[in-house]
Amino acid sequence: MSEGFDILKPTEADIQKLLMAKVHLGASNCTTAMSKYVYKRRSDGVNVIDLNKTYEKIVLAARIIAAVDSPANVCAISGRNFGQRAILKFCNHIGGAFPIAGRFTPGAFTNQIQKAFQEPRLLVLTDPLVDHQAVREASYVNIPIISLCDVDAPLRYVDVVIPCNNKSPHAIGIVWWMLAREVLRLRGTLPRDAEWDVMPDLYFFRDPEEIKKEEEAAAAAKEAEDDTGYTTQWDDAALDADWSATGTGNFAAAPADGNWGATTGGDWAAAGGEEWTN
């Protein structure tokens, strides 16, 4: 990593997060422009990305984003499904940036007639290859571009490159999470000696089918709980009650006076005064 302030360098925990998310595993093909970010090439053909340079570019990109006067002038785009949840969380956490998750509407930066027209001052992408339409239109109107780039990504019109594995959902999520955290640190919202209370898992892609199954399972469990009458919710009065207290009545009192073994004065076997069989 280039010389600079030690406070801006990655910690051991940051490097471990990047390694666990497989941010360093690049594609097998490598362009000439991206070769300077490659640490080495493995025997299986995978290019290993230098994580120190990755974190250095994350800090540089965060400094550019923090320099924009209003977060609403920053536009985050992800045509790739793995990055759509990440950009939505990123835009929310940095204070209201404009996200475009999914298909980019052609002419959104150049055609002033349509409703989707936007004039951002900065563009942040997940993949310049997938979001090529946004890259081309941004070049027409001179919008600076920051992009997550794999070693096989085209760098034309891209101003700041964040070298990483942008094809893995965990790698994309952790890079966007670190970018948002660094922006908050540079703004002074988050102290550098404090842990961010937002977990990286919040930025990871989740399969809609998996979410649907979890919701159905939770609904079924709640329905079964309602049918049986079983509940785990107890109020404070019931929990604080003294269940060992004795009652106020005298349940051990002696029986009433009298000879219970004496014979009765009447003849219970006597026949009735009239014939019942008539």
From Swiss-Prot:
Q: Does the keyword Cytoplasm apply?
A: yes
Q: Which InterPro entries match?
A: Ribosomal_uS2, Ribosomal_uS2_C, Ribosomal_uS2_CS, Ribosomal_uS2_euk, Ribosomal_uS2_euk/arc, Ribosomal_uS2_flav_dom_sf
Keyword DNA-binding appears in the UniProt entry: no
- PROSITE patterns per the UniProt record, alphabetical: RIBOSOMAL_S2_1, RIBOSOMAL_S2_2
Which keywords are on file for this protein?
Answer: Cytoplasm, Ribonucleoprotein, Ribosomal protein
Give the span(s) annotated as Disordered.
Answer: 216-235, 250-278
The protein's name is: Small ribosomal subunit protein uS2
Species for this entry = Monosiga brevicollis (Choanoflagellate)
Upper taxonomic lineage: Eukaryota, Choanoflagellata, Craspedida, Salpingoecidae, Monosiga
